[in-house]
Amino acid sequence: SEVKMDAEFRHDSGYEVHHQKLVFFAEDVGSNKGAIIGLMVGGVVIATVIVITLVML
């Protein structure tokens, strides 16, 4: 019974840590719109490189 409780507690605390990371990430992105623009630009660059590579083949 104690072992089961311990396992459940670990699972819950693991979930809490994961949830806090998600919340922190969301707040970080919300306060730093430059990061979102940077990610979008990076995505466009990567997509362009892939398209050029496919056209070259």
Curated annotation (Swiss-Prot):
InterPro entries: Amyloid_glyco, Amyloid_glyco_Abeta, Amyloid_glyco_Abeta_sf
Any one cellular-component term (Gene Ontology): early endosome
CDD domains hit by this protein: JMTM_APP (cd21707)
Location of this chain's protein in the cell: Cell membrane; Membrane; Perikaryon; Cell projection, Growth cone
Tagged with keyword Secreted: yes
Annotated Cu(2+) binding sites: 11, 15, 18-19
Post-translational changes noted in the entry: Proteolytically processed under normal cellular conditions. Cleavage either by alpha-secretase, beta-secretase or theta-secretase leads to generation and extracellular release of soluble APP peptides, S-APP-alpha and S-APP-beta, and the retention of corresponding membrane-anchored C-terminal fragments, C80, C83 and C99. Subsequent processing of C80 and C83 by gamma-secretase yields P3 peptides. This is the major secretory pathway and is non-amyloidogenic.
Topological category with respect to the lipid bilayer: Single-pass type I membrane protein
Record: residues binding Zn(2+): 11, 15, 18-19
This protein's UniProt keywords: Amyloid, Cell membrane, Cell projection, Coated pit, Copper, Cytoplasm, Cytoplasmic vesicle, Endosome, Membrane, Metal-binding, Nucleus, Secreted, Transmembrane, Transmembrane helix, Zinc
Gene3D superfamilies per the UniProt record, alphabetical: Amyloidogenic glycoprotein, amyloid-beta peptide
An example molecular function term from Gene Ontology annotations: signaling receptor binding
Transmembrane segments: 34-57
Top-rank taxon, per record: Eukaryota
GO annotation (BP), single: axonogenesis
Primary localization class, coarse: membrane
Regions of this protein lying in the Extracellular compartment: 1-33
Annotated positions for site Cleavage: 12-13
Assembly: Binds, via its C-terminus, to the PID domain of several cytoplasmic proteins, including APBB family members, the APBA family, MAPK8IP1, SHC1 and NUMB and DAB1. Binding to DAB1 inhibits its serine phosphorylation. Interacts (via NPXY motif) with DAB2 (via PID domain); the interaction is impaired by tyrosine phosphorylation of the NPXY motif. Also interacts with GPCR-like protein BPP, APPBP1, IB1, KNS2 (via its TPR domains), APPBP2 (via BaSS) and DDB1. In vitro, it binds MAPT via the MT-binding domains. Associates with microtubules in the presence of ATP and in a kinesin-dependent manner.
Function: Functions as a cell surface receptor and performs physiological functions on the surface of neurons relevant to neurite growth, neuronal adhesion and axonogenesis. Interaction between APP molecules on neighboring cells promotes synaptogenesis. Involved in cell mobility and transcription regulation through protein-protein interactions. Can promote transcription activation through binding to APBB1-KAT5 and inhibit Notch signaling through interaction with Numb. Couples to apoptosis-inducing pathways such as those mediated by G(o) and JIP. Inhibits G(o)-alpha ATPase activity.
Family under the similarity heading: Belongs to the APP family.
Protein name: Amyloid-beta precursor protein
Gene behind the chain: APP
